[in-house]
Design a protein with these regions (language model features):
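Flexible, low-complexity inter-domain linkers and amphipathic docking helices that mediate domain-domain
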Residues: 1-91
């Protein structure tokens, strides 16, 4: 599900991220509120680092290991990653 008016890339990224987080947290996709801190759902350092690895392996994004702590909700992660993916190569 995407926010009305959201760019297609952000919507696709939100779907991928929500599915990936649901898998790692052992929760149904529909149970994750994008505004709720992921720690509420049991996000820990192992899940956070696994997500960073998924972003690198599957999306080609190099992100800091503190990503989930710096951006603790799905909405915050999507906002950050959308900016990151829009940045020109070789900044």
């Amino acid at each position: 599900m995407t926010t009305p008016g959201a760019p297609p890339v952000a919507g696709e990224l939100r779907g991928w991220l929500t599915e990936r987080l649901a898998l790692h947290l052992g929760r149904p996709v529909g149970s994750l509120d994008p505004r709720t801190p992921l720690a509420v759902y049991g996000m820990d350092s192992v899940c956070a680092l696994t997500l960073c690895g998924d972003l690198e392996d599957e999306r080609g994004l190099i992100v800091p290991s503190t990503l989930v702590y710096d951006h603790p909700t799905i909405d915050a992660l999507v906002a950050y990653l959308s900016v990151l993916t829009a940045a020109p190569v070789g900044r």
